[in-house]
Amino acid sequence: MHARKLIVVLVYILTVLVSVAVSKRYTSEKRVQNLATFKTMMRYGRGGPSPNNKENKVNIRPRADAFFLGPRYGKRSGWSPNASLVYPVSTPLCGLDEDLSCAYTGISDLYRCTPRKGESEEFTTSSN
């Protein structure tokens, strides 16, 4: 009875040791050896001067191959004063009649306009 328990415990310990060894070997193969070389990989053909071409030395600073996502990725540039406006500020919403006061109704290009100086018309509907 004790021999049977001893065999089960030994098989369990052997299984744990084999699984640890396999997982350790797997992670060591997948890990990058030197992180500095990963960040400074050079583009093809710019690895440095060759011993044959000593007279044609070109000083080119290599760029990193890796792309690092930063906080400014995809953001637009700041406001430019020369940019064209979608809605020109100089023209009023209700056309050229400046005696009207118009309010947006919630429907695209539909405004409710009222006269500013107390004229006889109560409400007019305008489409801009």
Curated annotation (Swiss-Prot):
Q: Organism's domain of life?
A: Eukaryota
| Keyword terms | Amidation, Cleavage on pair of basic residues, Neuropeptide, Secreted, Signal
Q: Which residues form the signal peptide?
A: 1-23
GO annotations of cellular component type: extracellular region
Pro-peptide positions on chain: 26-29, 47-63, 77-128
Q: Example GO biological process term?
A: neuropeptide signaling pathway
**Transmembrane ranges?**
none
Query: What is the annotated localization of this protein?
Result: Secreted
Tyrosine amide carried by residues: 44, 73
Q: What does this protein do?
A: Neuropeptides RYamide-1 and RYamide-2 are ligands for the G-protein coupled receptor RYa-R. RYamide-2 is the most potent activator of RYa-R.
Q: What is this protein called?
A: RYamide neuropeptides
The upper taxonomy is: Eukaryota, Metazoa, Ecdysozoa, Arthropoda, Hexapoda
